[in-house]
């Protein structure tokens, strides 16, 4: 019996002291040992080695003690390199992962990050005074996640909106530090300027040189397409963005009708300005012409709701609503994360061109304004979005889209602009042309062309709402 015990003791001793060979096709790190002075536990640290087999002595392999307060056992990630513009690094356990946010300028980037620590199960490291996130490859749930693993993020009006895997809001109200490609933004500012100018000046120049009548098919197509653009902008872009602002979890407003109330105020203010202008015009005309002449002129030139759509005041109200939200477009485009910037920029280019076309289609209809006045109105639209972009570049390193004051400012302007555009789009443009204008008794062909143009404007602008 004693001999048997000695035999098993010897066998166990032999097994525990033998060298164990691990075969793998992956790159492992050379095993080194480090002992702690407190409990004598031996830890295994790996260093990279290109080899198909690595020998590890079983006596040096022990499992480190679990620590519920931290999931990161090292304080640095090293061997950082690039694959397809994404920076990958390796942590102390040989796990490869990517660095978020994705850097836009790949020059002079560090090959390692230190000061690594854990927040809610996620690993963060320091790049100077900036914090970056290290996400292990097996933990990445979505390639489009810009904030952290398990989050799906996108930008609406410059504000990042994130949801987790259960479609619950995953919003941080603190400012997120990002690297912005400022030279790119400055260069594309001029592209927006040119595109907006083409849209706003194009119809004016066309009518000036070709001298088309208001009932010409080209003018009808431009005007009805523009009407569809304005209607879609109000409903799909402004009201949707405003609702996202007012429903943001960082904004503690209990009244759910805030955005709709401000939109209603925008409609009322647009109406009251136009009504007062009408009363002033009527009072001025009463002293000059017979009341009968006023009524005859009104039946031919004015719509039943009180003021001619061709009047300068009406178009100025329309332009005011467009300008309010165009300056926001410039600001929010610039502060968008680089991952989404180019996509949003392309959408905004089309957005500004279509909206400039819509505004200009009404500017050319003004009968009581000179050419210079029309050109100034077109120039104001062309400049306003680049001005917004310049403001955005100036506040780039301070902007926090989830700050309550920012949300209130953006939400108020979006809601108010929606109200103004709803009044001008529905009353001054759509209703006037179709119920009280020349399209009321137009031919079947012209009616069909106008209707298709109207629907096309709505569809295209609504489609852009998927990205902007």
From Swiss-Prot:
One GO cellular-component annotation of the UniProt record comes to: plasma membrane
> What reaction does this enzyme carry out catalytically?
Zn(2+)(in) = Zn(2+)(out)
Q: What is this protein called?
A: Zinc-regulated transporter 1
Q: Which residues lie on this side of the membrane: Extracellular?
A: 18-185, 239-257, 336-338, 396-406
Record has Nucleotide-binding as a keyword: no
State what this protein does.
Answer: Zinc transporter that acts with PRA1 in sequestration of zinc from host tissues during infection. The pH-regulated antigen 1 (PRA1) binds zinc from its environment and then reassociates with ZRT1 to acquire this essential metal.
Recorded topology in the membrane: Multi-pass membrane protein
Checking PANTHER family in the record gives: PROTEIN ZNTC-RELATED, ZINC/IRON TRANSPORTER
Q: Where are the transmembrane segments?
A: 186-206, 218-238, 258-278, 315-335, 339-359, 375-395, 407-427, 448-468
Give the record's keywords alphabetically. Cell membrane, Glycoprotein, Ion transport, Membrane, Signal, Transmembrane, Transmembrane helix, Transport, Zinc, Zinc transport
The residues the entry assigns to the signal sequence are 1-17
- Family statement: Belongs to the ZIP transporter (TC 2.A.5) family.
Q: What InterPro entries does the entry give?
A: ZIP (IPR003689)
Q: What is its main location?
A: membrane
Biological process per Gene Ontology, one example term: zinc ion transmembrane transport
User: What changes when the gene is disrupted?
Assistant: Leads to poor growth in the absence of exogenous zinc and impairs assimilation of zinc from host cells.
Pfam families, sorted: Zip (PF02535)
Which GO terms label this protein's molecular function in UniProt? zinc ion binding; zinc ion transmembrane transporter activity
Record's note on what induces expression: Expression is RIM101-dependent and up-regulated in alkaline conditions. The promoter contains 2 RIM101 binding sites 5'-GCCAAG-3'. Expression is induced by macrophages during oralpharyngeal candidasis infection. Expression is also increased during hyphal transition, biofilm formation and surface adherence.
Q: Which residues lie on this side of the membrane: Cytoplasmic?
A: 207-217, 279-314, 360-374, 428-447
Highest taxon in the source lineage: Eukaryota
Q: Where in the cell is it found?
A: Cell membrane
Q: Which residues are glycosylated?
A: 57, 67
- In the UniProt record, the gene name given for this protein reads ZRT101
């Amino acid at each position: 019996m004693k001999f048997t015990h000695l035999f098993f003791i010897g066998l166990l001793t032999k097994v525990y002291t033998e060298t164990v060979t691990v075969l793998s096709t992956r790159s492992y790190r050379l095993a080194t040992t480090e002992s702690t002075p407190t409990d004598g536990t031996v830890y295994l640290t790996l260093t990279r080695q290109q080899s198909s087999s690595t020998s590890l002595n079983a006596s040096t392999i022990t499992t480190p003690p679990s620590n519920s307060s931290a999931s990161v056992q090292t304080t640095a990630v090293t061997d950082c390199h690039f694959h397809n513009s994404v920076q990958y690094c390796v942590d102390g356990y040989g796990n490869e992962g990517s660095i978020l946010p994705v850097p836009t300028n790949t020059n002079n980037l560090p090959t390692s990050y230190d000061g690594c620590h854990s927040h809610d199960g996620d690993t963060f490291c320091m790049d100077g005074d900036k914090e970056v996130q290290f996400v292990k490859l097996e933990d990445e749930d979505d390639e489009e996640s810009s904030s952290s693993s398990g989050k799906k993020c996108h930008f609406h009006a410059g504000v990042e909106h994130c949801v987790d895997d259960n479609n619950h809001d995953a919003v941080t109200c603190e400012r997120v530090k990002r690297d912005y490609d400022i030279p790119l933004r400055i260069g594309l500012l001029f592209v927006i300027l040119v595109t907006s100018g083409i849209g706003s000046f194009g119809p004016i120049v066309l009518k000036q040189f070709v001298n088309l009548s208001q009932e010409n098919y080209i003018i009808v197509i431009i005007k009805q397409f523009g009407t569809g653009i304005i209607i879609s902008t109000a409903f799909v872009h402004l009201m949707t963005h405003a609702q996202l602002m007012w429903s943001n979890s960082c904004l503690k407003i209990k009244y759910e009708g805030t955005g709709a109330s401000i939109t209603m105020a925008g409609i009322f203010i647009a109406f009251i300005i136009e009504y007062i202008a009408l009363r002033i015009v009527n009072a001025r005309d009463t002293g000059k012409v017979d009341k009968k002449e006023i009524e005859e002129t009104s039946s031919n030139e004015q719509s039943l709701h009180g003021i001619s759509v061709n009047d300068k005041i009406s178009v100025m109200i329309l332009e005011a609503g467009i300008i309010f939200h165009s300056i926001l477009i410039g600001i929010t485009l610039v502060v968008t994360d680089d991952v989404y910037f180019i996509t949003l920029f392309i959408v905004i280019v089309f957005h500004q061109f279509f909206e400039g076309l819509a505004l200009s289609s009404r500017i050319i209809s003004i009968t009581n304004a000179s050419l210079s006045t029309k050109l100034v109105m077109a120039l104001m639209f062309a400049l306003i979005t680049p001005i917004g972009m310049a403001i955005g570049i100036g506040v780039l390193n301070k902007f926090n889209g989830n700050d309550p004051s920012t949300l209130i400012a953006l939400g108020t302007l979006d809601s108010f602009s929606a109200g103004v555009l709803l009044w001008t789009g529905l009353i001054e443009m759509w209703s006037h042309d179709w119920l009280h204008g020349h399209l009321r008794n137009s031919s079947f062909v012209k009616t069909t062309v106008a209707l298709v143009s109207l629907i096309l404007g709505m569809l295209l602008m609504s489609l852009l709402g998927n990205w902007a």
